[in-house]
């Protein structure tokens, strides 16, 4: 970048809106797993959509590439600048712009932390249902850019389903205002959907209008032992049928995952008296706690008679509920502390999850005998975090060196089931070079056409998702 371009960018954001200090920039150049490490000499921190727009206009004019970043919680390298690009942090775009209680909608800037948005909705007696382990750090812009899923997809859908409107800064600096709060709008192409899940490669999301829902008056949570993933799938069908659609979360947990959490997370304990090979964490929401508890207990008793359920425990307080959820939410952290691990974020039809787990696990163990399967996640929507920890006492570096080989084998099996190699984390750089193996030529051509049309100079997050 030449001196003139640097000066123009600094002038746009002012002295508080940029940093060239390596120690300040460094935390933004490495993601949580430490798998990807980047490089950038300049971090811009605009505090308005107009500043973002002006930054993009200058970068487009001078062919200066940049990488947008939210809370830096992404897991596939999509938010990391690898070639010295300008780092565009959206953390200062952190205002809740408006909450319309009657319309059940909320307008927020892209840098608002997910937990902050949830809290703002709760204060108005409403619910923003997107919920995931990184919600204390992840931002709305990042959630939108990756089309995040989380634990409530079963009832409320993925992030894409929770968006009414968007504001997007385009590569040439124009600001696209799609901030409609309408639930029905059939006036041409739904342009906002192009940018959701695009990982900042087509435009920079600066604000959004989000759907809100009535806050449930009651919630019941159960930790349930099941003999197999197949039993879990059948239990899900039974619970959905008997609950009338009140099941909001249904999470699969393997015994080894529970053991890792108890080993590495202070205060974690087994909720049940006897071990089981698998568990599910079930949550239902509705109007009356007593009715929810009674209905869930009756459904679990019926499932037990069918051999689908072993032991189970229902949370009797908010503290107990939080303790049960912490077992699921700390799974990734516990696996990280355990050592080297190879991870996959995949989805298959719910009915295919048991066979997928069996076949894919066998394929990995054939390649790496002794590898420890830690498969968990959102079985209610078919999204499994298909992870493996390195063999006990094995060489972690040697295990990680086989990531691409193992990933390819797993993704081939996913594809055979008509599944997706990225359920909710995105493509980034991790899966970019495999995407063409599982997408048709027509799909890839259309994706490249969109990229060339909206970003002809390839300044927006270059090298991510799709190459042009």
Task: Label each PLM-derived region with a short phrase.
Residues 95-251, 460:
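FAD-binding subdomain of flavoenzyme oxidoreductases
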Residues 1-57, 74-104, 257-269, 318-342, ...:
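N-terminal flexible segment immediately upstream of the FAD-binding catalytic core
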Residues 174, 432-468:
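Activity-critical C-terminal alpha-helical subdomain
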Residues 70-73, 93, 133, 255, ...:
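Short, ordered loop/turn segments at secondary-structure junctions
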Residues 21-29, 224-225, 233-402, 406-409, ...:
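C-terminal substrate-recognition/cap domain of FAD-linked oxidoreductases
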Residues 101-104, 222, 394-395, 430-436:
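Short beta-alpha connecting loops at secondary-structure transitions
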Residues 1-31, 61-64, 303-319, 416-421, ...:
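N-terminal accessory segments
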